[in-house]
């Protein structure tokens, strides 16, 4: 008993003076003592001390001991995941945090943010793009802050079919995640290619208002793009009602989709909903799921978020577009 008391005092004094090494030796000596009460708290304290000393293998040993003993709480699990990560074992970090995330979801709870962040960081270290994107999606699902959205959207703006890219850029614009001048330029060009000068002009006006172009050559080039879009707006607006009637009478969903998006670009969201609903009903668009996605956008812009979520969730047939629709659904909720 005397040795136990001496080690307790030695450990306390060592901790008070910042001598973690001596404290660890004293408390480890006492861990198996018959006089040591509250073993769970002692194991957790030793785990923390080893972590603070950057002895991650030993911290992991105590973390696993806590798990086997049934006294691993959220703080222990977080420290164990951090120990795996700091040790450079990113596969173990990813697997461990993925399990913790799944457990929380099965209980109907939001996973801890640090579990999600460590899982995402591991995916990035492992250069697993699919895992990285899924990690960002989880973050914005449970903790939808601007930084998470910005990181997610930058991972989405790396190519793909034009329809997917256009709607990814639209979402990035919606959440304030367009950070580079080239992002605005590409969104405007994609809109123009789809016959949407109103949207293209609006995008470029926002870009200039935010002063995202700093080089004179970029300013000149994008001024020409803005002027090109503006020069088409008058004719586009003048012919929109006739185009709407022709699309309604025709058999092609593509015409309805163009009209719906044109109406949206001019703030006429009720008309956009009607045209998009026609496209959905016809069901013969070139890209599977695009009509439902455009309908969701129109409903979202019209302020009918429940209808927008329903439409986004109905997007099927194109995996890349389904992913974008899922993110739009998260935004609309």
Predicted region positions:
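Post-signal peptide N-terminal segment of secreted/secretory-pathway proteins
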Residues: 1-67
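Residue at a conserved register position within TPR or TPR-like alpha-solenoid repeats
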Residues: 14, 50, 84, 123, ...
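Alpha-helical repeat scaffolds
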Residues: 20-31, 56-68, 91-104, 127-141, ...
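Long, contiguous interaction/recruitment modules in multidomain scaffold/adaptor proteins
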Residues: 180-183, 189-237
